[in-house]
From Swiss-Prot:
GO terms for molecular function: DNA binding; DNA-binding transcription factor activity; protein dimerization activity. The lineage of its organism: Eukaryota, Viridiplantae, Streptophyta, Embryophyta, Tracheophyta. This is Transcription factor bHLH144. Keywords: DNA-binding, Nucleus, Transcription, Transcription regulation. InterPro entries: bHLH_dom (IPR011598), HLH_DNA-bd_sf (IPR036638), SAC51-like (IPR037546). SUPFAM superfamilies: HLH, helix-loop-helix DNA-binding domain. The keyword Nucleus applies. Residues 9-18 have a biased composition (Basic and acidic residues).
Length: 251
């Protein structure tokens, strides 16, 4: 018993129609009567003898859409108003909707991930004002900085990452980086009270991180943040080795 298989279309069997251009309206003059008008807009009609007689195939690609059918179904299709509605729906919802709104979708996604420029400015300005406010912060802490910084050592190696390797991996030079950052941020200071409070809070947080992270006082903001993450991971591993607490695999 012979197995029923789907027939190959003309662009798959390698015949003379394989490299022909897509059919246009003039290709159907021999199939449709002179008074017949094609009811489809934006969808190409593709009659083919290799199509099954009981199938009407809607094919959609990136740049075109077509309806393929057996030539004997031509007159039946022309007398079927519901097919016209189906083709219009296919064109509007799938062709226009899928590809016409692709750019709008990208724009919506990108707009949902916008960063707060005030927070970025506060982080960038932490390096600029760190040296000026370091002495004042030490006096306000009342000696607490000595207790916080007991674990600090510039030569400590954790997670195969040292303070020197962190700064070198970012390609930063502290002196050149501070000078260039001062120039880029000279006109970006905010005059509002809310921005001033946010900058002060951010600088205080970075000051604490610099005292906690080994070698943090010799790093810029980006290196301090990266080293803080690595340092916390190393502390988590050490605590797990000692059997202290129950930690989940979250970082």
């Amino acid at each position: 018993m012979q197995n029923n298989q789907f027939p190959h279309f003309s662009d798959e069997v390698g015949d003379r129609n394989m490299h022909n251009p897509y059919a246009s309206g003039s290709s159907y003059d021999a199939l449709f009567p002179p008074c017949a008008k094609l009811p489809y807009h934006g969808v190409e009609l593709q009659p083919s003898a290799v199509c099954p007689k009981n199938f009407v195939i809607f094919d959609q690609t990136y740049d075109r859409s077509q309806v393929m059918y057996h030539p004997e179904l031509t007159h039946k299709l022309m007398n079927t108003p519901s097919l016209n509605n189906l083709a219009s729906t296919f064109q509007n919802e799938y062709v226009g909707g899928s590809y016409g709104n692709y750019g709008n979708y990208e724009q919506e996604v990108s707009s949902s991930y916008q960063e707060d420029p005030n927070e970025i400015d506060a982080l960038l300005s932490a390096d600029e004002d760190y040296e000026e406010n370091d002495d004042n912060e030490g006096e306000e802490d009342g000696g607490d900085s000595e207790e916080v910084s007991t674990a600090r050592t510039s030569s400590r190696d954790y997670g195969n990452t040292t303070a020197e390797s962190c700064c070198s991996s970012y390609g930063y030079n502290n002196n050149n980086n501070n000078n260039s950052r001062k120039q880029s941020l000279s006109g970006s200071a905010s005059s509002s009270n809310n921005d001033g409070k946010g900058r002060k809070k951010m600088k205080k947080m970075m000051g604490v991180l610099r005292r906690i992270v080994p070698g943090g006082e010799q790093m810029n903001t980006a290196c301090v943040l990266d080293e803080a993450v690595q340092y916390l991971k190393s502390l988590k591993i050490e605590a797990q080795k000692l059997g202290v607490g129950h930690f989940s695999n979250q970082s």
